[in-house]
Amino acid sequence: MHILGCLDKPTSGEYFLEGKDVSQLNDDQLSWIRNKQIGFVFQGFNLLSRTSALENVELPLLYGGSDIVASERRKRAMGALASVGLADRAEHHPNQLSGGQQQRVAIARALMNNPAILMADEPTGNLDSRTSIEVMEIFQALKAERGITIVVITHEPQVAEYGSRILTIRDGHIVSDEPNFRRRLARYERNEAPVAEGSAA
C-alpha cells in the first residue's frame, strides 16, 4: 500500500501511475499526488480528539495549502459528511461517536480533495461485523456514484468479497489476481452494470 499510495518508492521494478514512473518523481511531486489524487483510510481512524467531525474532515484542505475560503471549505466538508450519512454528527467530537461513525468521518476526510483513488488499509479491522458491512457498503456507493477506484487491503475474506477484483498476497508475493465472478454474477442477477476492470471494492 505504501508504494501504491506513493508513500514509498519501489527498490526494484516499476510502478506507473497515470502514465508516470513514480520512482522518477521528486518529493514535491509525490506529495502533490498524495494530497490531490489519493485518499487514505486506515484501520486506526487518526482523528484529532479535540476537534469536531466537521473540522477533522476539513483538515486536508488546510494542510494542503488550499486557497478555498472558510465558508466553501465548510460546505465541502458538510457535503463529504453527508455522503457517508453523518451530516447530523458534524459537531460531535470523536469520543462522542461510535467506531463505525469515526471510520465514516475518516472516509469523508479522505474524499475532501476528490481523489481518483481511495486506499483503505484494513478499514474494518477495528469494527464489528455489522459495522464492517456498513463501511463496505459506503465504499460500494462511492464507487458507483463517483467512479473512484477503491483499493482495500484486508485479511478478511468476507470483506474481500466486496471487490470486483481480488489479489491475494502471500509472503510478499502476489499468488493470485482474479476477477470476482461471484460478485459480477450477483450484479447481473440484479440487472446492475458491472464495475469496470481494474477497480477494487
Language model features: what each stretch is:
Residues M1-G163, T168-I169:
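ABC family nucleotide-binding domain
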Residues H173-A201:
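Conserved beta-strand-loop-alpha-helix hinge in the C-terminal portion
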